């Protein structure tokens, strides 16, 4: 490389750095305001806790990603503000014996979660096992992260296992909020995995500090999702059933779903009210979509029911699930996956149109169209007759 080329390369690098800096400095007003409040609070207290950051940027905050995490960290660091796990007085309280603390924490949970000594013993055994794993120094963290980024699976595994205690220490602080201790640990471990995937060792951050963001985010998001379980009042259920019936009638007549305005006319209610009803219904009636020429059966009939105690009935349901999968495979891969996600055939949890849309990176309306088309295909005699014969088999078994 001659001298002129070197000068041009250096100029290009400087321009790129300047552009990157300009992009970094430009923040949406709502984010900038929240960061300024954190800085102000940090200067007043002399530190910032993760709880302070959670309040400023809750789990459902739009735009929470790796870049935002790094930006918050940089801004606080720039002003000489340290991030600490807890308020100083809380740190003193948490210094008690681990085993005694665990017993007290488990006592606070609902009896049905931990009334089994086996559950308690398995938790204690898990804590004992991860307690044997030595903690890493910042230098070891960076080296393992560097190797993990290059595809070293053993380095990645060691980085994860060495931070399992961190997950437990964070999970303890969220007990009594709707999830069992085991579930909290599991969700926290998912956050830890995400942190390992996204950690950039070249930034100079301590991995455990960076991972704490993702662990807390995963746990608080899981708690928030749990809290969203909707209990619909009886009068609303009746309204939803009526709306559903009118939608089916309209679809049979016109071959397409009615618009909000058309539903409003049929129901004699304003469009805004129809939107409210649909919002309340989307998580609870998704399993009611009919299958079969006579529309006398639904997807719900094929979803495994964990409350069934009889091994014979459970085996029958498992068989039906397998047969349903065979039928779904006659659809296009996208149609089949949309139905699996919408009706909870993957994990027993139905997904909203928006959630499925995010998975496929398309609009809610596009997912609705795919779903309607797929259900129309399932109503074809070549498929629906087979499903109906399975239903009759199940009826005989239950009789």
UniProtKB/Swiss-Prot annotation:
InterPro entries, alphabetized: RNA_pol_sigma-70_dom, RNA_pol_sigma70, RNA_pol_sigma70_r1_2, RNA_pol_sigma70_r2, RNA_pol_sigma70_r3, RNA_pol_sigma70_r4, RNA_pol_sigma_70_r1_1, RNA_pol_sigma_70_r1_1_sf
Motif Interaction with polymerase core subunit RpoC boundaries: 183-186
Region feature (Sigma-70 factor domain-2): 159-229
Region (Sigma-70 factor domain-1): 30-107
UniProt GO cellular component terms: cytoplasm
Sigma-70 factor domain-4 as annotated region, ranges: 327-380
DNA-binding region boundaries: 353-372
Domain of life: Bacteria
Subcellular location, record wording: Cytoplasm
Keywords from the UniProt entry: Cytoplasm, DNA-binding, Sigma factor, Transcription, Transcription regulation
GO molecular function annotations of the record: DNA binding; sigma factor activity
Region (Sigma-70 factor domain-3): 238-313
Biased composition (Low complexity): 1-10
Keyword DNA-binding among UniProt keywords: yes
Gene3D superfamilies registered for this protein in UniProt: 1.20.120.1810, RNA Polymerase Primary Sigma Factor, Sigma-70 factor, region 1.1, Winged helix-like DNA-binding domain superfamily/Winged helix DNA-binding domain
Basic and acidic residues: bias regions: 11-25
Domain notes: Contains 4 domains, connected by flexible linkers. In the active conformation, the domains are in an extended conformation, each making extensive interactions with the RNA polymerase catalytic core.
Alphabetical list of NCBIfam families matching this protein: RpoD_Cterm (TIGR02393), sigma70-ECF (TIGR02937)
Family the UniProt entry places it in: Belongs to the sigma-70 factor family. RpoD/SigA subfamily.
Subunit structure: Interacts transiently with the RNA polymerase catalytic core.
Protein name according to UniProt: RNA polymerase sigma factor SigA
Origin organism lineage: Bacteria, Thermotogati, Thermotogota, Thermotogae, Thermotogales
């Amino acid at each position: 490389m001659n001298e002129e080329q070197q000068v041009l390369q250096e100029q290009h690098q400087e321009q790129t750095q300047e552009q990157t800096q300009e992009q970094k400095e430009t923040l949406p007003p709502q984010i900038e305001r929240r960061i300024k409040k954190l800085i102000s609070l940090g200067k007043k207290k002399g530190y910032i806790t993760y709880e302070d950051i959670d309040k400023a940027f809750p789990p459902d905050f739009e735009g929470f990603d790796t870049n935002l995490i790094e930006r918050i960290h940089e801004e606080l660091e720039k002003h000489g503000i340290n991030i600490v796990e807890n308020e100083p007085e809380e740190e003193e309280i948490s210094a008690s014996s681990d085993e005694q603390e665990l017993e007290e924490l488990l006592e606070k949970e609902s009896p049905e979660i931990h009334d089994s000594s086996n559950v308690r013993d398995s938790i204690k055994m898990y804590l004992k096992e991860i307690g044997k794993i030595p903690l890493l120094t910042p230098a070891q963290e960076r080296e393992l992260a560097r190797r993990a980024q290059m595809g070293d699976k053993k380095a990645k595994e060691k980085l994860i296992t060495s931070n399992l205690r961190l997950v437990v220490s964070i999970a303890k602080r969220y007990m009594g909020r709707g999830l069992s201790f085991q579930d909290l640990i599991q969700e926290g471990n998912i956050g830890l995995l995400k942190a390992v995937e996204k950690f950039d060792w070249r930034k100079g951050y301590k991995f455990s500090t960076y991972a704490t963001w993702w662990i807390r985010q995963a746990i608080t998001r899981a708690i928030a999702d749990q809290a969203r379980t909707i209990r619909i009042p009886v009068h609303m259920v009746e309204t939803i059933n009526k709306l559903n019936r009118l939608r089916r009638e309209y679809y049979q007549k016109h071959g397409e779903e009615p618009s909000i305005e058309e539903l409003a006319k049929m129901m004699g209610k304003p469009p805004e009210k129809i939107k409210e009803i649909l919002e309340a219904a989307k998580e609870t009636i998704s399993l009611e979509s009919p299958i079969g020429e006579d529309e006398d059966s639904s997807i719900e009939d094929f979803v495994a029911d964990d409350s069934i105690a009889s091994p014979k009935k459970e085996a029958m349901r498992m068989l039906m699930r397998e047969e349903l999968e065979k039928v779904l495979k006659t659809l296009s891969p996208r149609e089949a996956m949309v139905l699996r996600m919408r009706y909870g055939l993957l994990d027993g949890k139905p997904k909203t149109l928006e959630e499925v849309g995010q998975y496929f990176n398309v609009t809610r309306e596009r997912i609705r169209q795919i779903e309607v088309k797929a259900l129309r295909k399932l109503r074809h005699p070549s498929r629906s007759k087979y499903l109906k014969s399975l239903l009759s088999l199940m009826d005989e078994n239950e009789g």
